[in-house]
Amino acid sequence: MRAMRVIMNSMSEISESPPVLDEMVQRITERFSPDKIILFGSRARGDARPDSDIDLLVLFSEVEDPRQRAVELYQSLLDFPRPMDIVVSTTYRFERYRNVVNTVYWPASREGKVLYERAA
């Protein structure tokens, strides 16, 4: 069994029902084994409207085709009745560009909430 750590301490601050996020995180981790899942955008900031989407940055140590992996993630979550935006990248790329303004990594690193992180 692989080691993992799920971070739940900030879930009360997130403007999405925790059971939905818990289920999404569980499904993603079981099927895809990412390094980290970060919620960012309005739901992480706490200013989401009822029609706001769920923005997830899903990081892997390696991923050959990020777009294809994003499609696979979307397909695995089709039964969730929420609009979502899933960005797939590598942990290396996130760490390298997290301080670069106008990248998706910038807001994810500044305001994001880590929902899952694989134990080292």
Located regions from the model:
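Catalytic core of pol beta-like nucleotidyltransferases
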Residues: 1-36, 45-50, 61-120
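Glycine-rich beta-strand-to-loop/alpha-helix junction loops that act as flexible
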Residues: 40-42
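Short, conserved active-site loops that position catalytic residues or coordinate cofactors/metal ions
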Residues: 52-54
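Short hydrophobic/aromatic beta-strand micro-patches
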Residues: 57-59
